[in-house]
Each structure stands twice: as C-alpha cells, then as structure tokens.
Amino acid sequence: MSKNERMVGISRRTLVKSTAIGSLALAAGGFSLPFTLRSAAAAVQQASEKVVWGACSVNCGSRCALRLHVKDNEVTWVETDNTGSDKYGNHQVRACLRGRSIRRRINHPDRLNYPMKRVGKRGEGKFERISWDEALDTIASSLKKTVEQYGNEAVYIQYSSGIVGGNMTRSSPSASAVKRLMNCYGGSLNQYGSYSTAQISCAMPYTYGSNDGNSTTDIENSKLVVMFGNNPAETRMSGGGITYLLEKAREKSNAKMIVIDPRYTDTAAGREDEWLPIRPGTDAALVAGIAWVLINENLVDQPFLDKYCVGYDEKTLPADAPKNGHYKAYILGEGDDKTAKTPQWASQITGIPVDRIIKLAREIGTAKPAYICQGWGPQRQANGELTARAIAMLPILTGNVGISGGNSGARESTYTITIERLPVLDNPVKTSISCFSWTDAIDHGPQMTAIRDGVRGKDKLDVPIKFIWNYAGNTLVNQHSDINKTHEILQDESKCEMIVVIENFMTSSAKYADILLPDLMTVEQEDIIPNDYAGNMGYLIFLQPVTSEKFERKPIYWILSEVAKRLGPDVYQKFTEGRTQEQWLQHLYAKMLAKDPALPSYDELKKMGIYKRKDPNGHFVAYKAFRDDPEANPLKTPSGKIEIYSSKLAEIARTWELEKDEVISPLPVYASTFEGWDSPERSTFPLQLFGFHYKSRTHSTYGNIDVLKAACRQEVWINPIDAQKRGIANGDMVRVFNHRGEVRLPAKVTPRILPGVSAMGQGAWHEANMSGDKIDHGGCVNTLTTLRPSPLAKGNPQHTNLVEIEKI
C-alpha cells in the first residue's frame, strides 16, 4: 500500500468496505475512523466550540450548508445541516465528501497568501511577492491603457464557475462583481452559452421556446423513467441535490428506470431496471429508430401532435418548408436522404441490439406518463444540438409534455427561492462571442464573423482580446480544450497583453497570470447563497466569516473597489454606491423582503443559518399552462407551438458558413460528426473518449485535496475487451494520446464501459512540463480535447474525441 493510500487514520480499503461515501465524508471533515475511537470527552469538547454557518458554493450547483466548528480562529472540524425533521420534502441539506472536506481547502498549505506578479514566462508559475498597492496600480494602469488603445471590446471577463452560489462572491461572468466594475468603466466583450450546457441551452428553445423540465419529485407520478446520460448520483449527489428525491419518488411510483449511457454510472449501480450502453454521440440515431417503431405501430399521440406541434407531418408543416420536409418523412425514409430510420439502421450506429430498440420503443409508447430526460453529457458533443432536440422528440411523439409524471425531454427543473442579486448594470458593449471561442478571439479576433464564428451584436469583431479578468475559475487552462494549443496562444504576450487572476490556489490557470491576487473563500466572508439543483425544496444559507482574514488575502468586493478607486472617483462611486459588502447584503435582502414578506428578517436568517421552503405547488410541470390552454399560453417559439420543424434553424442552415462535416437542420435529425464513432481517424485513434463528473471534485475544485484524491483515483476507464487487445491489466500505467497531446495515468479495466469507448473523470489538475515534453501526468482530459466548437451553439464539444491507449 502506497503512502497516499493511508491518510487521517483511514485506508482506501476501509473506505470501500464502509461504503465509501459516508465514511469518507466524515474523514474529510477531520474525523478518524472507526467511530468508536472517538471518545465522549472529545465530542463534548467539539460541541462547545464556536459554530459558524457556511456553505459549499462550487459548481455542482447544489450548494450545501456547512456548520464549521472553530477554535482559536481555526476550523477544527466540519459538520453539515442538522436542522428540521429530515423527512422527505423537508430534508436536511447534507453536504457530500467534497463540502465536508472544506477544512482541508481552507487550511491547505498551498493557499495563495500575497499579491504576486509574474517573473517567468506565462505558464511557468514563477512569481514574486508585491504589495497590494503595486498590484492594484498595475491592474488599473493596464486596464486604462487597453481601453484607450483598443476600446472596451478588447477587455474580456473569463468564463468561471468556481463560485456559482454566491451573491457578492459570485463568479459567473455575466453576474459577477467584476462585470459590475467593467460596466461602470465602459463595458467589456460579452459572452453567451456555457461550458456545461451550450448545446442544449441553444437548441431546446428552437423546439419549446425555453429549456424547462419537470421536477424530479414528479417522478412519483410516472410509470416509466428513461434517462439519457443523466447521472445525478455523481453530478448532484449531495443532500442539496436530487439523488435522494429520485429514490423517494420511485419508491412511491415504482416506476421502471432505464439508463442509457456509454458508462454504467452510479445512478444506475443497482438502482436501474436496465442499462443500455450506447456509443457516444449516437443518441439521436437511437431516438430515430424508436420513432420508426412508434410511427409504424401507431403508438404516437396523433391528436397531441396535430394540436400542439409544428412539422410532425404534412398537416402542420410550415409553408416555407420543402415538400416531405417533415419529421415523419425523415423517419420513414421519404425525406432528402431516402433512408428509413429502422431499428436495424439505428442498431448499426448505436451498438444497441435491434430487439432492444424495438422493446424500448414499445415501453415508451405504452407507459404513460413517462418521464424522459437527458443529462448534459449527450449534448456536450460536436453534434450535441441535434442530440438535445432529438431526445425531446420521444415525449413529444407520445404526448408526455406538459403533464404530471411526464417531461419535456430536458433535464429536471428545481424550485429555488429567488434572491436579489448584486446589480451588474447595463453593458455599453453589445458585441458577444461564445464563451468557448475566447482563444480564437485572442488569436485572430478581427477575423471572427457572425455567420462563421457566431459573433453576435455586429458582423465581426473589431479587435482581439487584450485584457482578461479571471476570477474564481480554472477555464483559462484546465477546463478549456486543447491545453497545449491554449498554452501556445496564452504564452504569446503580444496577443493578450494582461491576464489578472484572482484565486485561492496556484491552479493551472493561475500559472498564466501577469498579476495574481489571493482571494478569500466564500466561507471566509459574509454572503447569502440560494439553492439550485435541489428538487422541490428551496433554501437560503447565510454565510458568516469562519475566521478572520489571514495573511494578505482579500475579498473580491474589496479588490474591485480598490481598482475602481484607481479608475476614477466617478467609477468608484458608481461601483460601490457608498456601500460596504455587508451594507450591500442588507440592502439587497431588504428588497427581497419587500417582494417576499414570508422570508425571515436579515438578523433572523443570520441566526438561523439556513431557511427552507417547499415548493407551494408541489411539483413543477414544464409547459403545463401551454398544455392546458395553448391559445392563452403560447410557447415562446415563432409559432407559439412546439416546433419539430424550425424555420429559424432552416434559415441559419441556409445562411451560415459551415464545414463539410457540420450539420444544422430544421429537424432533430441524427448526423455523424468529426471524431465520431464512424470517423476515418479511428484507424489511428480507435477509441472514443469522453470525460465525466467525478465524486472527488466539482470540475477542478477540490482537485488538490489529498484524501479525496486517494479515495477517488484518477483513472482511465477501458473495457476488458479493449484492454486485452493492448495487454493492459487493471491498475497498469498507460498513455492516452492523440494528435493534440498525451496523458499518463492508471487504467481502470471494467465492463462498466462500452467496448470501443474510454472515459476519465474531468477536472483533474493538469501537470506537465510545458517547456519540455508537455506530457500530462495529472490526468486532465483537456490535454486531449479539441478547440473546434459545435456548429450551432459554437459550444464546448469536450466529449467528442478519439484516442489510442497503450501500456507504458
């Protein structure tokens, strides 16, 4: 057993024997196991310590409450929500192993403590300590110079999700305090989309006008649950998440659950009735094969299609559509491609047997209501926009939209208590790019156009990005694609001239900073955080500083206020409005109380720590009002109906500049894509590769916590058939490589992944000698992913990759 396998009195073997999650959570919080070794005296001593409410506000989205025990200005141990009856519908918001390990993040020896400036090349991680005055003066001077020389469009706030839950501390670029500062100083280049949901958020509004789904709790009214790539047991596994609600809802309904995923996930893991492994990027082909059976066996809901939909057949096809341009013609082989989408056709593409496709179609066609949903993995493909719209066709064809127990085909919705956010003000700059295209905007911004690159607000960019704010995010490098190419672009200082990083640790992104500033964590400052991704129970968490400020770490509001001072008294006044961070919170909460008098007072919430409220409507049913009365409650589509055929997409397909292997279609069709299952490149790189969300991290956050790394090792999943061909045994060190880069890590040989497919947890910290061989020993999947965006959303296709794996 290696030294990394035994920490804080708990071995990996013991963890596994103890069902891992619960035991590890306690260990990460500072306990030693077994529990009997804890003396009663120690328990009494801990109970008498000061307890401060905090929260884990990272981008799993669930935002769990933490009770941090503090002694002598140090966090000694961590527990979680202990309020209420802990019954279904009013459950305790219990943090997972990540949140419970926050003490290790707070006290980590690698915390950033002082402002620093770069003294080596970008990416080398060489810095020297400077004063706050020098750091702030440098930032303000560079920002002024950039705006004077290039204009505000040359300033960019990098995509970030390190603090999605916070209000004053929120890092989301469109809603952060950084955005407010820039809007007080003439604005900055906008961005649209996200690394999580670019394709589905773009595509579903063409069908429904929005991207809503029924709440998970509504599964208690379902007869069948079909999940395409939806894995809440790992992506939303905490007490604030929906895994518990999924289990409870199925207990009530006894609904059969079918999981469709290339990987046998923990959401399946014995909970499912059936797992159907599928080749990545082929979900739309499976849907088409199912649709063929539904149509030919008269299992479609024709009255629903006639009344609520546009483009299913010739009766509702828009006048501007070509003859036989409807969905039914596409499925039956009467459209342009003259290919019937039979189960045999679908089986060759998906790898799912013909008889199972037919059986699944009949199950979907006869079980009503059926809850058909998709996670965000299937859409994070190069053809993800088509996939998202295609999966939505199953509830549309069967009339499961807008009813209790049904769904729209989207991911589940949650009930939240709306909070009053720090206003970011209007951005004078109206130009925007896809959040995934920022490296292009640095490298060749003025060549980017609306019809080729998705520039919005004008026909083309006028200037490249010259100044980057990177606050509480690792998307500058680690979470962006093709790290080696990104490194090449960022290291050229003649392109982007200033990078400001505000962080807690020396992340992969922080190594590329010109000025690096030490931020406080959310638990070290006052803030109010709402829930998200938490079923039908909303809550608010009041965070108080768990300790005093240490070293020279500062909160984001203070940092930006000081920059604002240096930009001019008018900017400072407009940014702060004369308020401190605490005064802003009180001001914003007063607005919340005026709109929602049922909320506790500010002081009451501060004392409570957490306030919970169940959805007064019980469950959220997406598009129920439309289903009940489509005339009075039209959808936000051009027709006001569900648009199976989208004239808007037809126009985009006709006018945009696309590559030969890119498809934008008015119908939710299946299309092959670059680096897909049928790509000619498979002769060199035969394995499909995708990343998945891993228990030990939320993206890259918590990726440096040793106890989590020991319990949840970074490995590449490979099927025994593929491993045997390569002479690979479980635990062997292997090289995973393609023409973009190489990663070295252990192999996990398991039948839990489809032959021909490999996978690794995304978010591992990139560790490579970037002035040498560039081989990544940290296991970061983005060493291997592509910078080429998807056709419509111009979004992140990080699950579309081909690789080879060899034993070292």
Predicted regions located by residue number:
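Extended redox/cofactor-interaction regions of prokaryotic respiratory oxidoreductases
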Residues: S2-K3, P173-I260, T267, A285, ...
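N-terminal export/assembly segments and adjacent metallocofactor-ligating motifs
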Residues: S2-L299, G325, K466, Y471, ...
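A glycine-rich phosphate-binding loop feature that marks nucleotide/adenosyl-phosphate handling sites
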Residues: S160-S161, K307-V310, I364, N407-T418, ...
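Long, well-ordered, tryptophan-enriched scaffold segments
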Residues: R263-A367
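Active-site phosphate/pyrophosphate-binding segments
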Residues: K323-H444
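Phosphate/diphosphate-binding loops
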Residues: E497-M498, P545-A564
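Catalytic or ion-translocation cores adjacent to nucleophile or general acid/base/metal-coordination motifs
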Residues: L520-P545, P755-G756
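Long, contiguous, secondary-structure-rich segments that constitute the structural scaffold
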Residues: I556-M608, S700-Y702, D706-W717, I721-I808
